[in-house]
């Protein structure tokens, strides 16, 4: 059972490459709650991105394929406080952008220490 009294907050801004780019990996002995996962297009052209989830020890499963972000779109929300996403130790999220460094992933995570994991 995670220790719910001790939480570490992690925020990351990750430019997606044109090949698989790690967005977030849940550390050993932790349970994580993705409170926000959003994507932004900073280019002057429409862009797409893929989002994959890999369970610890498993193979990547694509969650979104060629998801479009139009030009001048501020942010596209995938997970937020009303729709969190739970991860276990070793689970990972990764993404691929249609053009290197033009699609930006923004992630906010609560990490809970779990000595039994």
Regions found by a protein language model. Give the residues of each.
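Intrinsically disordered, low-complexity Pro/Gly/Ser/Thr-rich segments with frequent PxxP/GP/PP motifs
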Residues: 58-92
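A generic structural signal for short beta-strands and their flanking turns/coil linkers
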Residues: 33-35, 45-47, 89-91
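Beta-strand signatures of extracellular beta-sandwich domains
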Residues: 50-54, 106-108
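Short solvent-exposed strand-capping/beta-turn motif centered on an Asx-Ser/Thr pair
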Residues: 39-44, 98
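C-terminal interaction-tip segments
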Residues: 1-32, 36, 97-117
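Acidic glycine-/aspartate-rich tracts in secreted/extracellular proteins
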Residues: 42-45, 56-58
């Amino acid at each position: 059972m995670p220790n719910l009294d001790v939480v570490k907050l992690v925020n990351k801004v990750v430019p997606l490459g044109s090949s698989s780019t790690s967005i977030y990996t849940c550390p050993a002995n932790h349970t994580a709650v993705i409170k926000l996962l959003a994507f932004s297009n900073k280019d002057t052209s429409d862009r797409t991105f893929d989002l994959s989830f890999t369970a610890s020890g498993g193979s990547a499963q694509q969650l979104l394929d060629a998801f479009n972000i139009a030009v001048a779109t501020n942010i596209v929300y995938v997970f937020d406080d009303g729709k969190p996403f739970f991860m276990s130790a070793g689970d990972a999220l990764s993404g691929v952008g249609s053009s290197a460094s033009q699609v930006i992933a923004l992630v906010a995570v609560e990490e809970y220490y779990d000595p039994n994991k």
